[in-house]
Amino acid sequence: MKVSLCFLWHMHQPHYKDPETGTYILPWVRLHAVKDYVALPRIFRQFPSVRHTFNLVPSLLVQLQDYVENGAEDIYLTLSRKNALDLTRDEEEFLLKNFFSAFPPTMILPQPRYAELFMGQDAARRAIGKPGATGGFGASEYTDLMTLFNLTWFHPMHRDEDDELSRLWRKGRGYTEREKAYVLDRQIEIMSEVIPEYRRLTEKDGGELSSTPLNHPILPLLIDNRAAQDAHPGAVLPKMPFAYPEDALEQLVRGRETFRSLFGSYPSGLWPSEGSISPATIDLAARAGFKWAATDEVLLSKALKKPVLRDAEGVPLEPNWLYSPYRADTPSGTVHLFFRDHHLSDLIGFEYSRWDAVEAVNNFLKNISLIYD
């Protein structure tokens, strides 16, 4: 059975940069870059008959460039570069609190040394500032912790392609400062590959890139915060109305300019921040130059005043109206609208990563088959 499917992968990170210090307070742009952002399009390249759309949020793209071109760092990266012999008590506490920020079943427990440190973190925390206390971490433990935290975030593809990363992953413990530095430097190198990888996706692989307003604002509320009562009648609003449609348009325009500066052309497609749309939002999207937009089925359900009824398997009982494209004619032009299947999206985004790969694929194909039957 041959079916038509649209896959849209949303890549987003909000701004994490502290404007006063110039340092990023969280590491997620860097860590997700080495985990997903390069690996996904490379994996999909192995299946040239399947087309994908990637939504790249401008705030993510700007931060990637900042790391790669300006040498920006986050506080996790800066601390990771420090020799474990020179750590302060506060830094040790920070490491124990934050350097197990990974999904244990797949990113911590499979690596014996990381699992050992994970299990011992509470005792190590109690021993801080108490020389000789049972369970305390020394320089070797902290060096291993910093190295393994950064190493586990690499997608297995990157570890397999890099002999040194592969060796370090197999080594598992007893890391040197030089080995730790290699891991950190390799992260920045992979970050530099993100934008070229997606440029290749559009130029050679037949994929498409879409985008989002510059700083990921909720456009309907930025245009007029009274729009909240359209979705939630009776919602309590500030006494002073808030309406800045000019700013909303500027967010769209600047986002498109950021995109064009990196990829050489403007995006045709828009994934509005958090999927939030309204008639005024669609009009501004058309005015900015977008030709299509995608959002969630719940908005279509509200617009048509029709509930999305599903059977026990999660299959919509009335699929035709949900899986149809829609056309919105606005004073500024036409925008074609597509609405995602919320159930399938949640399976891909939140459930299948916990499943056996074959079982996840079979379940997804079963869902698609049931929908088309």
Question: Over which residues does each language-model region extend?
Answer:
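N-terminal regions that are enriched for targeting/export leaders
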Residues: M1-H52, S59-Y182, E203
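Acidic (Asp/Glu)-rich catalytic clusters
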Residues: M1-K2, I43-S49, I195-S211, R226-A228, ...
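Conserved, mostly hydrophobic/aromatic
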Residues: H10, F44, S210-T212, L270, ...
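Glycine- and acidic
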Residues: K17-P27, T176-A181, D230-Y244, G264-S268, ...
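Active-site-adjacent pocket scaffolds in enzyme catalytic domains
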Residues: L31, S273-D373
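Short, solvent-exposed turn/loop segments enriched in Gly/Ser/Thr/Pro and often Arg
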Residues: N55-L60, P213-H216, G269-S278, V298
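Acidic, His- and aromatic-enriched active-site or binding-groove loops in soluble protein domains
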Residues: G71-L109, Q229-L249, A286-A328
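CE4/NodB-like, metal-dependent polysaccharide N-deacetylase domain
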Residues: G234-E274, K366-D373
